[in-house]
Amino acid sequence: MREGIHPEYNHDVLVKCACGNTFTTGSTNKELKVEICSKCHPFFTGKQKIVDAGGRVDKFMKKFNLSNEDVK
């Protein structure tokens, strides 16, 4: 590998989640901010939490004139 072209790797980078959870990892960044982590992600918590990007489901339902009863 050539010297001087690779970014500096930090072994103790603090990761902050929107839920308040923090943990450390390794990265070329000095600090990381994430929206969802293993403490608040529905897959790991078992709780149902809707993460809808811009109301895409509602947009789809309106486009095809569907209601919740039609889908079930």
UniProtKB/Swiss-Prot annotation:
Gene3D superfamilies: Ribosomal protein L31 (4.10.830.30). The keyword GTP-binding does not apply. Zn(2+) binds at residues 17, 19, 37, 40. Pfam families: Ribosomal_L31. Binds 1 zinc ion per subunit. Its cofactor is Zn(2+). GO terms for molecular function: metal ion binding; rRNA binding; structural constituent of ribosome. Disulfide bonds: none annotated. Coiled coil: none annotated. One of its GO terms (cellular component) is ribonucleoprotein complex. Keywords: Metal-binding, Ribonucleoprotein, Ribosomal protein, RNA-binding, rRNA-binding, Zinc. Binds the 23S rRNA. Belongs to the bacterial ribosomal protein bL31 family. Type A subfamily. PANTHER family: 50S RIBOSOMAL PROTEIN L31, CHLOROPLASTIC, LARGE RIBOSOMAL SUBUNIT PROTEIN BL31C. This is Large ribosomal subunit protein bL31. It comes from Clostridium botulinum (strain Loch Maree / Type A3). The gene is rpmE.
